[in-house]
Amino acid sequence: MNSTQSPVYRTSVEQKRHAQEVAKRQRMGNQMPRLREMLREKYRKRIIETRNRCTDAQREIQLSELREILRLELSELEKDVELEELILEELLSDVNEWYALGEKNLETLYAEPDEQQKEVLCPVCQIKNLRHHKGAFICECGIRFEHSANMEQLQILLQQQIASHELQCTQALRFFIEPASGQLYDMCGSCDYFSSV
């Protein structure tokens, strides 16, 4: 069987790969595994460094955002604290004014009568002084009541009413004008004290 054609070899893909591997080994000799290990180590280091750089960059972005959020929150809290301090100062000044006015009214109400003092503080509004005109007592707050006493006697009567009430109760008396009779009365909502002046 003589054939003029060249023989056909049937080699598989695996056989070709094996042949290539053998040829590489013969060319490179024993250096091939060391070179492969060295390249592997270099790539592994580069991957670790790249991953660390990316992670650090992400952390830095997150930290800067967190710092900015904290800075904004702190500035808002400082504004709130300043506002609360202003409100507290206003409240304290209001309380001090109210307390001073109350003290002044109490001093006027409980003042010892002397010959020169003819003024009596209005028991209803406790701000203005009463005026005596033709048997009636008038205040600028709008009240008017009739009483047979003069200014000094009325002041003594008011002080006696307050003192007798304070023996039984710690609350302040309320004075009012009864519309039908036009007389001055006092009462306490706490102890049910009620009396005419």
From Swiss-Prot:
Pfam families: RPA_interact_C. Residues 1-20 are annotated as: Disordered. GO terms for molecular function: zinc ion binding. A zinc finger (RIP-type) spans 122-191. GO terms for cellular component: nucleus. GO terms for biological process: protein import into nucleus. Keywords: Metal-binding, Zinc, Zinc-finger. This is RIP-like protein. It comes from Drosophila melanogaster. The lineage of its organism: Eukaryota, Metazoa, Ecdysozoa, Arthropoda, Hexapoda.
